[in-house]
Amino acid sequence: MKKILKEFLYRKGYKINKINKNNLLNDNPFLAIQSRLGSNPIVFDIGANLGQTILKVKKIFPNSYLHSFEPSKVCFKRITQDYGNVENVFLNNKAVGHEKGSLEFNEYSWSALNSFFKRAYTKSEIIDTYFVDIISVDDYCNENDIPYINLLKTDTEGFELNVLKGANKMMNQNKVQFVFVEIFFHENYIGQSSFSDIFNYLSQNGFNMIRFYDFEYTDEGFASRTDALFINEKFIK
């Protein structure tokens, strides 16, 4: 009977599949990991921009401890106004990299493109350039007595590999559970991190990729960018 019904609906243009109870397959990355993080996870939002991730995380994890990093003077002023008084949101007007220091930062006319790198093609112009302070994830955790990171999100417009290298100690000690990282396939920035570099680095540090989210394509139809979710293999059940 089930087979007959399935074939009938298929001829009508409908396809029936079993409900997949694996939360990791949820189209929303934050809902995908919700059941594995508990009610008050520690989240690192690296490359906060205008606070988009703060809003998403606090909606799903209202009791989370969220450490947000944004080097842009303009963007940081905005997120301070919007989220400066939100409980357990810690705002840092710094960039994150593989070690402490400072580096020249490019502010674009569209803030989502702000980066240490110059664009490979011009759809937005640089309106300001200045040096910003950089801290590593490992140093920040050490200085602020942060025992672990449930979710490390990095969206830094090509600087992702540098961010991840700065979390090497935390990763090696299995103190990072999930990594949510922006990936470029097409050259968007000169000198950007490649997909293979990021994938290989995380694999070498014991992370398995779960899936991609929000694929974008070039005008020619080639893969341009996406976001990828990785899980530390020590947390796979």
Predicted regions span which residues?
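Phosphate/nucleotide-binding beta-alpha loop and adjacent structural elements of enzyme active sites
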Residues: 1-237
